[in-house]
Amino acid sequence: SRGVDINHNFDAKWQMVVDKPSPSKYGGEYAESEPETRAITEFVRKEQFDMLLAFHSQGREIYYDFDGMTGENSVEIAKKMAEESRYAVCIPTGTASYGGCKDWFIKEFGKEGFTVEIGTGQNPLPMSMLDEVYDENAKIALCAMHECAYN
């Protein structure tokens, strides 16, 4: 996509990352400059979700914060998801903390948003890890659905 890292093209301090086309971390000429980003944001705006999970690889971490903003129950929900999956709960730092889908969702809607960094090891993750990664992240997704339904 023209050297734009879609992970940093969302309107949430997207300009804080790399400022020219690059294999990674370039946020684009402007927020939502890429059709993939616009497709996601238009869909989310239309559907008005209560919570958002953005899955990336890798790190076995759950991020819940954007620029000091969190949804009302974000920390508590992140801890529950971490308990289910054995992932760590983290606040992103550096360029990882800007321009992402979760960041935009928190900024735009003030609701719980999470980035789940799946698996560890090489990138991309090998197919041999599929069952393990699926099991861990199915638990995270089920926990999130439970929180949306009952809280």
Q: What is each PLM-predicted segment?
A:
Residues 86-93:
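Short secondary-structure junctions
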Residues 26, 30, 63-64, 87, ...:
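Sequence-level detector for tyrosine residue identity
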Residues 125-151:
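His/Asp/Glu-rich mid-to-C-terminal helical/loop segments that flank catalytic regions of hydrolases
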Residues 44, 82, 105-106, 145:
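N-terminal cationic-hydrophobic initiation segments that often serve targeting/anchoring roles
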Residues 93-113:
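Short glycine-rich, acidic/polar surface loops and turns
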Residues 1-75, 79, 84, 115-129:
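Active-site/substrate-binding loop(s) of hydrolase catalytic cores
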